[in-house]
Amino acid sequence: MSRRRESFRPLPALALFPTDQPGRRSDHGGGRIRVSLGAVAANYRTMRDRIAPAACAAVVKADAYGLGAARIAPALYDAGCRAFFVAHLFEAVDLRRILPADAELFVLNGLAPGAEYAALAAGAIPVLNSREQMEGWARLGRAVGRPLAAAIQFDTGMSRLGLPPEDAAFAFDPEGPIRWIEPRLILSHLAVADTPGHAGNARQRQAFERILAHAPPGVARSLANSAGCWLGQDYHYDLCRIGAALFGLDASPSAKAMQPVVEVTGRVIQTRAVPAGAGVGYGWAVTAAEGMRLATIGVGYADGWPRQLSAVGGAAFEGRLLPFVGRISMDSLVVDVSALPPDALKAGDQVELLGPNRTPEQLALEGATIDYEVIARLGRRLCREYVS
């Protein structure tokens, strides 16, 4: 006897997971990031006014510190920003699609061999960090018959990127590669700007001045990052590169002047009561000393909450700390809700993981890192919501 096979008709994807509808992805994920574009713009204006008459450029590398360059860069442009810094060429290519043509896009890591034409096609301005990068960019300029815009970076003490100071004469030799390069900016980067009294700041500025003595007149100069802006006007030169301060992060005294930009919440998946002696999480790293009420939150180390926070971190609800219990997993973490009224939290509710009660600086201290990393490592599964 044959059995009639029923044809399988899957439901439309939209009916199951309406992720393409604005604001709906958060209904189906474990957590959400709320980014205030208005606060980003306000922070830009604060720093712009602070450093005037120097220009204020925005550092939006690493997807605007993980918060979404596609939304943040246009908001900064609308606030008056016209110069943007990224780390890699592909980031500049992506921004070129969404920013007007008068936005200058600087690529801090310079150019990989063979990437010169792609940079030219994207209208990017490479930050040239070596003789080889200068020579490669100049070869393309000679091939197209005109000098090509670039920035030139010198290493004054960071030991990371840039030509050594002794190459200043080479870099600006009118018979050398500079003949086919249009220098838009000469820059260096401060290593200890977040320690205002450190003697290294003055040493780097003095080294920068010696380099500038070789430079042609009229080329813009840049030394300060967010923290460097608070070292005094001698460090501002013509342009400051502002990153952390835009996002409300601790960059020396600027943190007190900046508006908070980001909040992260996690969704309660389940609550439970456990008896004394119950193990919690992988390895039973925690055993309940007495009866406890626990809530499982749909955020884990894949979303930016690393395992090293397991024993020290926590969430917040209505201003009250909810300590983490047991080891943080890839997709979830557990908090102690024993101090809350029994019905205070239920499945679907949100707890604060990052915000006014759990600041980036607190998470950085607990995780033995810096607040920049706390923001930059936020996972792509967290739904990003933007408010103006």
Q: Predicted segment positions?
A:
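Active-site-proximal beta-alpha core segment in soluble small-molecule metabolic enzymes
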Residues: 25-27, 31-42, 52-214, 218-222, ...
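Active-site anion/phosphate-binding pocket segments in diverse small-molecule metabolic enzymes
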Residues: 3, 8-41, 45, 49-51, ...
